[in-house]
């Protein structure tokens, strides 16, 4: 059965000064899938995510759950759309658990309910042991995992309408936590029928966890397909200028990008 489209962008363009960052992008995202936005530095991945999330305001055509973006009140949309940015400028001496609980601000919950939900997602993202630590004293990776728990908390009460956007969520993480973060994101998509959109640089991580790959180059979509179709030596050479061969993981079966020589 075809999955319903929950987010659609049509003819999306973005320009900063004289630089055309995005050029007439048409893209749609469905419930229950993980979509990786990929491409070299400056391809437009994060800019596209910011447009789609509403972080960059635009008069262009974006729809959430079949309803025009401009028709949504921000408070209502925040119950259904959560964005994990590349970095946070939070500098106040909050405790780690208080940062996660900030995700519940859009929700009408008691303090006890907020605590229970926050603890659930802190366990999933492996930050329970940091609960009473001061946020500014944490490492970059620990902060990244805390904010992931915060965004999951934000979406806990959103019913069957969930869009989770992650902008380079593994950039500060060690190997084990990279995989745990993407495993949690995929589980969130499948178990809660959520749409998950994630900006990544690692093609092999994307191949393992994403259902679809949207590869951008110079502000345009080069390919929008499953990993098996998106990852070819020709596409990788054209987009990244890198000579690669495509293998296959011996047990999990997903495509593996390897040096051609």
UniProtKB/Swiss-Prot annotation:
Enzyme Commission numbers on file: 7.6.2.-
Topology with respect to the bilayer: Peripheral membrane protein
SUPFAM superfamilies registered for this protein in UniProt: P-loop containing nucleoside triphosphate hydrolases
GO terms for cellular component: plasma membrane
EC main group: translocase
Subcellular location(s) per record: Cell inner membrane
Cross-referenced SMART domains: AAA
Disulfide bonding pattern of the chain: none
Single GO MF annotation: ATP hydrolysis activity
Domain ABC transporter stretches: 7-243
CDD domains per the UniProt record, alphabetical: ABC_Iron-Siderophores_B12_Hemin
Keyword set, alphabetical order: ATP-binding, Cell inner membrane, Cell membrane, Membrane, Nucleotide-binding, Translocase, Transport
Residues binding ATP, per UniProt: 39-46
InterPro entries documented for this protein: AAA+_ATPase, ABC_transporter-like_ATP-bd, P-loop_NTPase
Biological role: Part of the ABC transporter complex HmuTUV involved in hemin import. Responsible for energy coupling to the transport system.
NCBIfam families: PRK13548.1
Subunit structure comment from the entry: The complex is composed of two ATP-binding proteins (HmuV), two transmembrane proteins (HmuU) and a solute-binding protein (HmuT).
UniProt family annotation: Belongs to the ABC transporter superfamily. Heme (hemin) importer (TC 3.A.1.14.5) family.
Protein name from the UniProt record: Hemin import ATP-binding protein HmuV
Species of provenance: Vibrio vulnificus (strain CMCP6)
């Amino acid at each position: 059965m075809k999955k319903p489209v929950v987010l659609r962008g049509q003819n999306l363009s973005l320009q900063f000064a004289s630089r055309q960052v995005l050029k007439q992008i048409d893209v749609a995202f469905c419930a229950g899938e993980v979509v990786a936005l990929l491409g070299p530095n400056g391809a437009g991945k994060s800019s596209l995510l910011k447009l789609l999330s509403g972080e960059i305001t635009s008069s262009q055509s974006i729809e959430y759950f079949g309803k025009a973006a401009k028709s949504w009140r921000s408070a209502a949309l925040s119950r259904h759309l959560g964005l994990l940015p590349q970095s946070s400028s939070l500098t106040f001496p909050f405790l780690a658990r208080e940062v996660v609980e900030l995700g519940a601000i859009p929700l009408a919950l008691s303090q006890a309910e907020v605590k229970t939900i926050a603890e659930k997602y802190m366990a999933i993202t492996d930050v329970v042991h940091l609960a009473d630590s001061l946020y500014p004293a944490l490492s970059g990776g620990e902060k990244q995992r805390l904010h992931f728990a915060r965004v999951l908390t934000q979406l806990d009460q959103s019913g069957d309408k969930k869009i989770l956007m992650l902008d380079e969520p593994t950039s500060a993480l060690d190997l084990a936590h990279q995989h745990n973060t993407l495993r949690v994101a995929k589980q969130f998509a499948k178990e809660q029928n959520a749409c998950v959109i994630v900006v990544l640089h690692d093609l092999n991580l994307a191949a393992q966890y994403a259902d679809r790959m949207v590869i951008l180059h110079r502000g345009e979509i080069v390919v929008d397909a499953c990993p098996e179709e998106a990852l070819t030596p020709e596409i990788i050479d054209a987009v990244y200028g890198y000579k690669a061969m495509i293998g296959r993981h011996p047990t999990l079966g997903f495509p593996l990008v390897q040096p051609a020589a």
